């Protein structure tokens, strides 16, 4: 018996055996307690949907490389908890139905878990079409298609109707922070928030990010650190608010942000 069968039958409402229900309940309780340990409240429906995401991810991953994490217990920490840590530092994220984009979403992280835990109208983008097709299928299976969708898109290729549209932008371990500040700026509405999720941030990266923030019209709101359970890693979340206009026209040509990034002067 596997958790895949358990969550599928539970979410779709099909009848489960007692052993199946017991196994599902154990994972749902583990997730509930895990989130509560970090001060994150969740409903039973949200936990069902979060588990459904992991179920679908593991199943699709058999044929398409979306993640190296194939253990349900590790996925609860490294995918679900990790994705939801921004809720600890950005209360505004769940304050109403807002526009949110997750860039470089991969297997739907952190965007899909954050969409599950909020009422935000959510767009998940990635440059790889196969990943986007998989993520859209997961969105539909979970039942969030009315307000969440996936689209193939590069960070530097911004349709006009996406410019200055989003209240929140997230990146999870995609690139250095100064580069992410540049990528996000054209998407963000005035006073919008960029949420950067990293494993480790050194002093040089922070200095470069500070310089880029001045150029692109941001203020640094906060830097918070977390330790994942079971020694599964250190996490940092940086929040930036768009408070002014960029001093240069963005986006630059494709590839320029990485090949010629804005950095702090080195003495």
For the regions a protein language model found, what residue spans apply to each?
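Short, charged/polar "capping" segments at the starts of alpha-helices
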Residues: 202-206
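Class I SAM-dependent transferase core
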Residues: 17-20, 27-95, 137-144
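Short strand-turn motif at the edge of the Rossmann-like AdoMet-binding core
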Residues: 174, 197-201
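SAM/dcSAM-binding transferase cores
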Residues: 207-267
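Residue-level signal for inorganic ion chemistry
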Residues: 57, 114, 198, 240
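Conserved SAM/SAH cofactor-binding pocket of Class I
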Residues: 84-175, 181-184
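Helix-to-beta-strand junctions that scaffold the AdoMet/dcAdoMet cofactor pocket
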Residues: 188-190
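N-terminal amphipathic/basic-hydrophobic helices that include classical n-h-c signal peptides
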Residues: 1-15
